[in-house]
């Protein structure tokens, strides 16, 4: 059973609350997002507080706020940070604040008891459950968002946003060495701003979010690289004895074009596996379709019409193939191929998980004379799966890339549909 904090309150003016939250976010260096039905306060990577709001009836009706957050598996330090944020909001903006905290920390503020009586027992049960499920010939995921990419599977390992762990590593630390697991599992285990929290925030971004691409490639790459570098340097300053992932730190400094600040004499953190799921191939989802692509490929959505559009994956830093995905649903029944691929070469067909796919390649005709010295080729693929027809087109500039593209299409999978309707 996860550890949660539930809260509710009232405010007289939603607009004043939004204005106040924007000012507070700027002062405290927090991220706050707003939408029609509520707001979200982000306290750390993957750690946030959600609030929904609703106007009460009557001319003088106030706004009722309700919300909650799951503080596992982020850790007792995150739980404390949520309580302190509620304290701040209760003094500043919220009226009639009510908090339900089953750990009792809201009332007694005993951090040691919170950690020893609630988070460590939760972690003990969690590790026991993981080891009961984790088989030597299979891979297990925990706390992983279903609608994002799927990391490469390694038998006998656990995939989490905080890193990959082997069954043996967990077994060796089960019981008396549980604290070692806590230091790596919990992103924010200890109270306040501390070196371990900064390091683990960096590790989470390195494992799950970082493309290991140059900061010049995109704004997203620059923000991710610099967040990691700054967090590791903060950790080093707060506790020079804390082991850090120095090899990856220096690599990210090179990708960001800056000189390393952490000295070479700093202790090196030892990991079982190379940090960064995106350093390897990953399974990228487009609705129910899953295609194995290089982890460095970045995704962009291009809207078309009302609610339609296409998704594109590629690496802007290199002359990589450009993968473009789109899809349409048949409201009257099963989807069928639209294209017989006439004029395509090396046409292949494949059936998998109830889906039917076919693809082939052709040279792209260049209209402008100046482009004709730089030939392009294209692989076109259709996948009919239940009521949906997926179109995959791959543009590439080197003939030798065709075999790799075909190999990836042969390894496509069909999973659960991510968007219903």
Model-derived segments and spans:
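Acidic (Asp/Glu-rich) sequence patches and key acidic residues
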Residues: 1-279, 306-321
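Hydrophobic beta-strand residues in large extracellular and virion-surface proteins
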Residues: 5-7, 21, 291, 323-325, ...
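Short, conserved charged micro-motifs
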Residues: 11-21, 331-339, 402-403
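Short secondary-structure junctions
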Residues: 25-37, 295-304, 342-357
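Short acidic-hydrophobic surface loop/beta-edge motif
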Residues: 41-42, 278-286, 311-313, 350-353, ...
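Secretory pathway targeting signatures of secreted, lumenal, and periplasmic proteins
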Residues: 285-340
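Surface-exposed amphipathic alpha-helical segments
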Residues: 289, 295-301, 388-421
């Amino acid at each position: 059973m996860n550890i949660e904090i539930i809260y509710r309150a009232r405010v007289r003016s939603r607009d004043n609350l939004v204005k106040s939250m924007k000012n507070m976010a700027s002062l405290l260096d927090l991220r706050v997002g707003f939408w029609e039905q509520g707001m979200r306060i982000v306290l750390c990577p993957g750690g946030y507080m959600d609030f929904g709001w609703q106007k009460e009836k009557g001319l003088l009706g106030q706004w009722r706020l309700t919300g909650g957050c799951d503080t596992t598996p982020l850790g007792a330090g995150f739980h404390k940070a949520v309580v302190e944020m509620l304290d701040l909001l209760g003094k500043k903006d919220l009226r009639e604040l009510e908090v339900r905290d089953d750990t009792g920390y809201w009332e007694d503020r005993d951090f040691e008891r919170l950690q020893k009586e609630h988070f460590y027992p939760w972690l003990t049960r969690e590790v026991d459950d993981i080891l009961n499920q984790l088989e030597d010939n299979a891979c297990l995921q925990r706390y992983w968002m279903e609608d994002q990419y799927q990391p490469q599977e390694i038998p006998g390992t656990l995939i989490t946003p905080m890193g990959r762990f082997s069954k043996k590593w967990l077994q060796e630390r089960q019981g008396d060495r549980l604290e070692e697991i806590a230091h790596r599992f919990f992103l924010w285990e200890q109270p306040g701003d501390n070196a371990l929290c900064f390091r683990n925030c960096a590790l989470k971004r390195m494992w799950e979010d970082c493309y290991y691409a140059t900061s010049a490639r995109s704004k997203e790459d620059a923000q991710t690289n610099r967040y990691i570098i700054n967090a590791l340097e903060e950790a080093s300053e707060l506790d020079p004895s804390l082991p850090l992932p120095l090899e990856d730190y220096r690599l990210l400094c090179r990708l960001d074009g800056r000189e390393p600040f952490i000295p070479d004499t700093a202790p090196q953190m030892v990991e079982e596996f190379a940090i960064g799921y995106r350093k390897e191939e990953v399974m990228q989802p487009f609705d129910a379709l899953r295609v194995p692509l290089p982890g460095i490929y970045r995704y962009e959505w291009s809207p078309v019409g009302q609610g339609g559009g296409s998704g594109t994956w590629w690496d802007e830093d290199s002359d990589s193939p450009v993968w473009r995905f789109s899809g349409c649903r048949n409201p009257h029944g099963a989807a069928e191929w639209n294209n017989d691929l006439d004029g395509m070469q090396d046409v292949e067909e494949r059936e998998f998980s109830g889906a039917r796919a076919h693809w082939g390649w052709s040279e792209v005709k260049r209209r402008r004379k100046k482009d004709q010295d730089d030939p392009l080729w294209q692989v076109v693929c259709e996948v009919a799966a239940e009521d949906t027809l997926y179109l995959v087109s791959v543009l590439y500039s080197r003939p030798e890339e065709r075999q790799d593209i075909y190999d990836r299409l042969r390894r496509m999978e069909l999973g659960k549909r991510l968007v219903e309707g």
